[in-house]
Amino acid sequence: MAYTANSASSELIAGPTLSTLSSAEGNGAAFVTPEKSESGVKPARKLPNITNSGPLLDRWGRVATDLRISLTDKCNLRCIYCMPADGLQWLPKENLLSAEEIARLADIAITELGVEEIRFTGGEPLVRADLVDIISRIHQAHPDVPLAITTNGIGLEKRAAALAEAGLTRINVSLDTICRETFAALARRDKLDAVLKGIDGAAEAGLWPIKINAVLMPGLNDDQAPELLHWALAGGYQLRFIEQMPLDADNRWTREGTITAAEIREKLSAEYV
């Protein structure tokens, strides 16, 4: 799995099962490769010293300063644009990076590669019981580096205060609708109340600004964009409509089945222009 600058956003992306980090010759990019073992026995993991430190550049010459670390592949929702209804076969726990390994990866990225901000994703990062420990380790070593998570918000109500105290700076919450029925249809779980309580908990913990990421799907929730925007404005949240990516395990994604930015603006302009 490559650890490189994202061509769209100039950020670095690391997956949950990465074991080695080295500097790619010639272009300053760093790559992380999965572990391999002919016997099937997991070898001892080591992150070698970076021999060529310095900023990471993508093919367009942009410097990547953000690192996104996927902490797990597990998720407690089954969003129709992301995962099949029956879920997936999760990675064995022993194959995931430990809190210590994640902290070391972050330290290398910050001290050797010029990373200035770290975001934790998944799967769903809140399913990691050691998330507070991960945040705390990195924050204690690098207190000036912003730390953020992208989450569905389930369970955040109970953990927001501890995460903020550990050093978490801000959150992005994935929320496509505030209609309970639509949420249940999209996420295949009736968990809207838990998400909204999680957002309230984050606000009470001082995790500002709270950013909301929403995916609009034609015929499902695209007509609810104005309602979602009104709710976000009332709460003081930053709302961003993001592109539906071809990540669904059912491989049913088509560009014709997505909604464009122009179409979103048209739906919003009727009420807000």
Where are these regions (language model features)?
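Radical SAM/AdoMet-radical enzyme domain recognition
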Residues: 103-119, 128-240
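Flexible loop residues that form catalytic
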Residues: 87, 123, 176, 215, ...
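Radical SAM enzyme core and accessory elements
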Residues: 1-57
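A short acidic, helix-capping loop that chelates divalent metal ions and anchors anionic groups
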Residues: 87-92, 158, 179-186, 248-252
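A C-terminal junction/extension of Radical SAM enzymes
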Residues: 221, 225, 234, 238-273
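Alpha-helix N-cap and loop-to-helix initiation/capping positions
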Residues: 93-97, 101, 187-191, 220, ...
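Flexible, active-site-adjacent loop/turn segments at secondary-structure boundaries
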Residues: 58, 81, 181-184, 214-218, ...
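Conserved alpha-helical substructure of the radical SAM core
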Residues: 3-5, 43-122, 126-146
